[in-house]
């Protein structure tokens, strides 16, 4: 039996149809998608984790998630279930919007407010992603860190 049997991976996929002003998002796991619009940041994806489910049920407070011993336990992942239901959503896309896709290696170490401030202050997507990556690495960067940013 392979040491990797039973393991899965996360997926956050975005398809932007600018001509139709539509953003399509497919998501499974604990990587995230954020929309930055008019100076505000919104998490579009929902974490598929045990602790996220506990928060929804009122069994855990949101501020307890970061330190919970089971915070990395996924409830959905690609590769574990042939009948997996992937979250698929459609959003309106507006001129000036930005889309951030990232792994939990970033969001475990950088707050949503910090994400927003870096994106708003950056002159371009490359500068913003490099700054976010540097912030996470300086704070310990113990997990893989992937950061993709589309600035509209």
Please describe what each predicted stretch is.
Residues 1-152:
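PP2C/PPM-type serine/threonine phosphatase catalytic domain
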């Amino acid at each position: 039996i392979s040491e990797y049997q039973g393991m899965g991976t996360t997926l956050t996929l975005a398809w932007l149809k600018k001509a139709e002003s539509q953003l399509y998002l497919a998501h499974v796991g604990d990587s995230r998608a954020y929309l930055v619009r008019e100076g505000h940041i919104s998490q579009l994806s929902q974490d598929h984790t045990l602790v996220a489910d506990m928060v929804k049920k009122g069994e855990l407070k949101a501020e307890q998630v970061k330190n919970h011993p089971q915070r990395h336990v996924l409830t959905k992942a690609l590769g574990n279930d042939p009948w997996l239901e992937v979250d698929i959503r459609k959003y309106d896309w507006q001129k000036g919007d930005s889309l951030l896709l990232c792994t939990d290696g970033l969001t475990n170490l950088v707050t949503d407010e910090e994400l927003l401030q870096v994106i708003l202050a950056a002159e371009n997507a490359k500068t913003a992603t490099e700054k976010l990556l540097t912030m996470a690495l300086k704070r310990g960067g113990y997990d893989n860190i992937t950061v993709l940013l589309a600035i509209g």
